[in-house]
């Protein structure tokens, strides 16, 4: 009986320890998890509209990433700065020409920002898309011309979220 209890406890401990392996099992292959979302960096250079379209085609409910809090900003910065440090990266923030303020791809209002110093400046009235800046380690944001070609980061909901 003692041996049975000991073996049962051992198997239980093993099961719990293995449950943490493959923690991104709720994300598609090649995507990394954070909170209830999955993210993927695309290293093809596209303009903002092409990047958004690629995100939508890549995954159901896919879109350019929304950075809605400091925790997500830091997580993405840490993940991205470990891989790339010379190209800015499109994410999902864009200036609504009709409404005159910044919106996420799903149309929701911005409640958290991390603009770089002096940004957004809408330089020459031609900057209505946002990018994570390489110079800041992908932590701060810069408004840019939507037609420029950059890497981009997509987001989708995790299967468990």
UniProtKB/Swiss-Prot annotation:
Describe tissue expression: Expressed by the venom gland.
Q: Per UniProt, which keywords does this protein have?
A: Calcium, Disulfide bond, Glycoprotein, Lectin, Metal-binding, Secreted, Signal
C-type lectin domain span: 34-155
Cystine pairs annotated here are 27-38, 55-154, 129-146
Task: Tell whether Transferase is among the UniProt keywords.
Answer: no
> Where does the UniProt entry place glycosylation sites?
35
Q: Which InterPro entries match?
A: C-type_lectin-like, C-type_lectin-like/link_sf, C-type_lectin/snaclec_domain, C-type_lectin_CS, CTDL_fold
Q: Where does Ca(2+) bind?
A: 127, 142-143
Which positions carry the signal peptide feature in this UniProt record?
1-23
Q: Extract the coiled-coil ranges from the record.
A: none
The motif Mannose-binding: which residues?
A: 117-119
The yes or no answer to whether the keyword Oxidoreductase is present is no
Localization per record? Secreted
Among the GO molecular function terms of this UniProt record, one is: carbohydrate binding
Tell me the Pfam families matching this sequence.
Answer: Lectin_C
Q: Which GO terms describe its cellular component?
A: extracellular region
The family annotation for this protein states:
Belongs to the true venom lectin family.
**What functional role does this protein have?**
Mannose-binding lectin which recognizes specific carbohydrate structures and agglutinates a variety of animal cells by binding to cell-surface glycoproteins and glycolipids. May be a calcium-dependent lectin.
This chain belongs to which protein, by name?
C-type lectin lectoxin-Lio3
The protein's organism comes out as Erythrolamprus poecilogyrus
């Amino acid at each position: 009986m003692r041996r049975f209890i000991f073996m049962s406890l051992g198997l239980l401990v093993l099961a719990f320890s293995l449950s943490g392996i493959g923690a991104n099992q709720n994300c598609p292959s090649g995507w990394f998890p954070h909170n209830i979302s999955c993210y993927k960096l695309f290293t093809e250079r596209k303009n903002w509209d092409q990047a958004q379209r690629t995100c939508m085609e890549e995954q159901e409910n896919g879109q350019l990433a929304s950075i809605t809090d400091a925790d997500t900003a830091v997580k993405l910065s840490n993940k991205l700065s470990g891989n790339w440090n010379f190209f800015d990266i499109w994410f999902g923030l864009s200036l609504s020409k009709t409404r005159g303020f910044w919106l996420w791809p799903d149309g929701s209002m911005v409640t958290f920002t991390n603009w770089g110093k002096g940004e957004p400046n809408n330089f020459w009235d031609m900057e209505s898309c946002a990018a994570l800046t390489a110079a800041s380690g992908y932590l701060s944001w810069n408004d840019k011309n939507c037609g420029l070609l950059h890497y981009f980061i997509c987001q989708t909901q995790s299967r468990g979220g």
